[in-house]
Amino acid sequence: MKKRIIACLLCVFCLLSAVGCTSSAPAEAAVSETTASETMVTESPTVEATAAAEGSASGDYLSSIGGTYVELFPELSKPEYRQIWIDAVTPLVGAENAEATTDMLLGMCMAGIYGPEATEKYAADPNSMAFDCYFLGGVQKFVMDGSIITGLDAEGKEIFSHSYQAMDVENENGFLFYQSEDENSGEFTYFAFSPDSMETTYHLEFRYAEDINDLQSWFEGNYAYWNAAGIAENYNLETMQNIIELFVTENLSSAE
């Protein structure tokens, strides 16, 4: 079983695979007891194995995730989906904790800083730790088409478009690495994908950088505390319900 760190640190409040939370605990107390040391997202072996198998079966993971992707967490946090969150977390943490739990789950993946700035801040204040799960480099949409990855800005203009080839890179995160076949690809030279798909986990997780060494750790280097998360642009309500339920169930059910 692979444990994937997504955001960090919500142990006593039973956010993200924590323990000890009960439905009778006041929300205010729960939030104040949040720690900054044990946040893990634990994916089920079945889901993860299926995602990895899809890539292998097709000969290449990248070719199996074709589509256009937007940032995940701005979509997850839209007001129209709030009740889905509340309905999902209430059975696990109680109605009195549902709002605070939802805010915390979302907030731990929506930090506005990463890299050395984040490392310095979190070293001084571990309880403030969170991950930046936004797209970087001005990209608002990623288009995956076979071996080609394209990034578009807010106006739909192309920022980059390169063909990528798979690499065999051993890394602590279990990510799948790709390298641009074009010279001077800048911060889009290397991509590292978690073996997710819209069919299995209803989202993608990936990182990219000019230096492959920056993609080896979530907690060190120029991209520390950054892990981009995307969802298919044409997702529907059922997909949104599925990803929220999966996220909540895998991160809170152990507290039951």
Report the location of each language-model feature.
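N-terminal helix-cap/turn-to-beta initiation motif at the start of protein domains
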Residues: 52-70
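Short, solvent-exposed loop/hinge segments that bridge or flank secondary-structure elements
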Residues: 59, 70-147, 189-199, 256
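Bacterial lipoprotein signal-peptidase II cleavage site
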Residues: 18-30
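Calycin-type beta-barrel ligand-binding domains and close structural analogs
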Residues: 122-256
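Polar/charged side chains located within well-ordered beta-strands of beta-rich proteins
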Residues: 14, 69, 203-207
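Positively charged n-region of N-terminal signal peptides that target proteins for export
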Residues: 1-10
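Intrinsically disordered, low-complexity serine/threonine-rich repeat tracts
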Residues: 27-53
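Bacterial N-terminal signal peptides
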Residues: 9-18
